[in-house]
Amino acid sequence: MSDFENKIEELGGKAKEAVGEATENEQLADEGRADQTKADVKQAVSDAGDKIKGAADKVLGSFQKDEEN
């Protein structure tokens, strides 16, 4: 899932939470908070994957430099 899709899910959750609170519908508010948490977790996993990929690319790059020498 892309950063954009995660942000859309988070914003949807905020909207759902706000509507739930405005209408005193606690179930809807809880669903909104859950949607936000889910989006935050997906974003954290995506960010961690990006960092791992960056580190792996750096390691592979250093091996390639060693092979050239």
Curated annotation (Swiss-Prot):
- Which parts form a coiled-coil structure per UniProt? none
Which Pfam families does UniProt cross-reference here?
Answer: CsbD
Q: Where is this region: Disordered?
A: 1-42
Q: Where is the composition biased (Basic and acidic residues)?
A: 1-19, 30-41
Superkingdom is: Bacteria
As for family, the record states: Belongs to the UPF0337 (CsbD) family.
* Protein name per its UniProtKB record: UPF0337 protein DIP1660
What is the source species?
Corynebacterium diphtheriae (strain ATCC 700971 / NCTC 13129 / Biotype gravis)
